[in-house]
């Protein structure tokens, strides 16, 4: 049970959990040790996912990650929440040396949330291009997006700031601006674009 895990890991603090998972806060400096011990001594041999979190620009600590470990023999999850000490330069230790499957999870968190995973063998963006200056899943990133210089292979205009969207594109949560469509069939629009977008007939 959770008390046995706490006694084995003196640095873990229990968290409230809405499900049956054992949930704990874990200091970043102990994350690798906790992952190794869960794998080797407690039979939590599967790292299911790593989810980056942003508590908001006014929060301190602001950034962190949630780790889910699963034991097939126990049919139980352990959830570790690890917050970054520095909100300006968020960083956590990489778990690639413990679980190879951490590779792409950490790259995604680095790409979209801007968390650096120290010790990662090849920490590169996985969705956005390398020169993209922002991290789209941060809470201060506008829902309507931001124009940014594109690599030559993507640019189709002289200043290379954006591409012309295909007819069914147009950014996140935009209604089609030209098609005739019933109100019940419209896709939702973000609050910061709805006011400026023309209404469909």
PLM segments and residue spans:
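Terminal low-complexity/charged segments
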Residues: 1-201
């Amino acid at each position: 049970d959770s008390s046995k895990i706490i006694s084995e890991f003196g640095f873990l603090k229990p968290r409230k959990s809405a499900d049956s998972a054992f949930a704990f806060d874990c200091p970043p400096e102990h994350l690798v040790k906790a992952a190794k011990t869960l794998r080797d001594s407690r039979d939590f041999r599967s790292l299911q996912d790593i989810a980056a979190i942003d508590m908001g620009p006014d929060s301190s600590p602001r950034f962190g990650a949630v780790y889910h470990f699963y034991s097939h023999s126990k049919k139980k999850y352990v959830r570790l929440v690890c917050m970054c000490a520095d909100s300006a330069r968020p960083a956590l230790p990489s778990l690639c040396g413990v679980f190879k499957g951490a590779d792409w999870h950490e790259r995604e968190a680095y790409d979209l949330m801007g968390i650096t995973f120290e010790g990662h063998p090849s920490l590169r963006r996985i969705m956005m291009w390398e020169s993209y200056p922002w991290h789209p899943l941060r809470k201060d990133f506008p829902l309507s997006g931001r124009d940014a210089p594109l690599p030559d292979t993507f640019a189709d205009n002289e200043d290379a700031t954006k591409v012309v969207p295909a007819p069914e594109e147009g950014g996140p949560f935009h209604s089609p601006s030209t098609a005739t469509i019933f109100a019940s069939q419209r896709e939702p629009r973000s609050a910061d674009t709805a006011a400026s977008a023309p209404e469909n007939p």
